Amino acid sequence: VDASHWYDDLTLVTKKWRGWMAFDSRAEKPVLGPKAVRRYFARAMRDIKTWSRERMGGIPALLGEYGIPFDMNGARAYSSGDYSLQEEALAANYDAVDESLIDTTIWNYTAGNRHDRGDLWNGEDLSIFCRDDYDSGRSETGDPLDRGGRALRGFVRPYAMATAGEILEMRFDTRRAVFTLRYRPDHAIAAPTEIYVPEVQYPTGFSYEVQGGEGEVKRGRLFVTAGLGAGEVLVRISRD
């Protein structure tokens, strides 16, 4: 498995989120404009898949590390409790993950993360969990199980956990909380497609539409079964 790492270098090094600017380290030039930045993120992740396929014998590609510094902008969020910038930065990364359809593991979860010392590694503070926030009882959702979690809305998103076929498109509109999945079903697979639908994005519930199949909600997940002979299945989930 090619477990390459990728980071938004400008944000990682400067510890500031600029949604309108990035630095393309391969081309060694700046990327300007919000749309251009997001296109660059997705292209960089697709390049990892292309490299694995064309230069490494077609082995699977896994984005083994990516993430953002939570102590950005002078660690203001630690005193204000406002992680909206971190949410925005994470969402931009996850939008690129969805667009490129690459498998990923975020960096990182550190059980002992503290505001004053970060992850205790290389001066980094990239953990999605903070012990100080946990000890203070801080929960972004009000649920005790979410105590200590940071910028949850940036990375706790709907996604296809298991797909009975080939994903053609997956995206999540963070502002409107609309999730779209389009896939080509493999009718030899008896199991349904399973989509994770997190309550943090749909606190008042959700509605769904399936074209080319039917759905069923169980335990906060949407299970989709393709219709007999369907060539494509389109799923849309929206907030109630």
Regions found by a protein language model. Name each.
Residues 2, 65:
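Conserved, mostly hydrophobic/aromatic
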Residues 3, 7-14, 18-31, 35-44, ...:
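Aromatic-rich peripheral "rim/lid" segments of glycoside hydrolase catalytic domains that contact
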Residues 44-50:
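A short, acidic, amphipathic alpha-helical segment used as a generic capping/interface helix at domain edges
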Residues 57, 66-69, 96:
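Extracellular low-complexity, Gly/Ser/Thr-rich intrinsically disordered linkers
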Residues 57-60, 100-102:
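Short, well-ordered coil/turn segments that N-cap beta-strands
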Residues 212-219:
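Low-complexity "stalk/linker" and mucin-like segments enriched in Ser/Thr/Pro/Ala/Gly
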Residues 223-240:
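Surface-exposed interaction regions enriched in Ser/Thr/Asp/Glu
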